[in-house]
């Protein structure tokens, strides 16, 4: 069993759906978790396809919720966005960008390949300070309510297995292979250093 709690980050594009669903589940399981997005702005589905509602990352979940409630309560209730923002508000005040975080993690999960690329690029561009390893794992998670829940449970299972292992470095590769087989999809994995 690991001597200290596993420090986990989950990163998606806007820190709204996939990363926050995982944040919610991991937190309920008692894990040390933070969640982030990587884009320059938060984009939510709008009333029409290809016309997202765009917010700055400094906008709180409550402000987004109230804005969408005023704009079209029925639409944003029907598509689940108000539910998601309500859940998010109970977890933390607002979305955060990974590139602005200075905290160190043991494992960072990303929810799609372009987010993985951004996270790895950001970590590699930072000046190394402690040479502490951080495992960056990508699992493509569909950006739907159901996809986010399924992805969050898979991330949770991996974290619980890692938390129980005697040596995370030795057991991670084998664990990822087992989880890939179970999930029916492959993961990207690399190690970066702080």
Curated annotation (Swiss-Prot):
Domain of life: Eukaryota
UniProt family annotation: Belongs to the SSU72 phosphatase family.
Classification via InterPro entries: Ptyr_pPase_sf, RNA_pol_II_suA
Function description: Protein phosphatase that catalyzes the dephosphorylation of the C-terminal domain of RNA polymerase II. Plays a role in RNA processing and termination.
Identification of the protein by name: RNA polymerase II subunit A C-terminal domain phosphatase SSU72 like protein 6
SUPFAM superfamilies: Phosphotyrosine protein phosphatases I
Single GO term (MF): RNA polymerase II CTD heptapeptide repeat phosphatase activity
Major site of localization recorded for this protein: nucleus
GO BP, one annotated term: mRNA processing
Catalyzed reactions per annotation: O-phospho-L-seryl-[protein] + H2O = L-seryl-[protein] + phosphate; O-phospho-L-threonyl-[protein] + H2O = L-threonyl-[protein] + phosphate
Keywords: Hydrolase, mRNA processing, Nucleus, Protein phosphatase
Enzyme Commission number(s) from the entry: 3.1.3.16
Compartmental location: Nucleus
GO cellular component, one term: mRNA cleavage and polyadenylation specificity factor complex
Natural source organism: Homo sapiens
């Amino acid at each position: 069993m690991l001597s200290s709690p596993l420090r986990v980050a989950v990163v998606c594009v806007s820190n709204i759906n996939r990363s926050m669903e995982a944040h919610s589940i991991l937190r309920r399981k008692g894990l040390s978790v933070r969640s982030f997005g990587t884009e320059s702005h938060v984009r939510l589905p709008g009333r029409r396809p290809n016309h997202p509602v765009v917010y700055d990352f400094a906008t709180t979940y409550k402000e987004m919720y109230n804005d969408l409630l005023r704009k079209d309560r029925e639409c944003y209730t029907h598509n689940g966005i108000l539910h998601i923002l309500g859940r998010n508000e109970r977890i933390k005040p607002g979305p955060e960008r990974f590139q602005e975080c200075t905290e160190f993690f043991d494992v960072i999960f990303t929810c799609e390949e372009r987010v993985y690329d951004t996270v790895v690029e950001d970590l590699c561009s930072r000046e190394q300070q402690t040479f502490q390893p951080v495992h960056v794992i990508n699992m493509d998670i569909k950006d739907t309510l159901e996809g986010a829940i399924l992805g969050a449970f898979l991330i949770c299972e991996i974290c619980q297995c890692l938390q129980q292992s005697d040596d995370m470095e030795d057991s991670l590769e084998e664990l990822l292979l087992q989880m890939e087989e179970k999930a029916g999809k492959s993961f990207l994995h690399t190690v970066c250093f702080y």
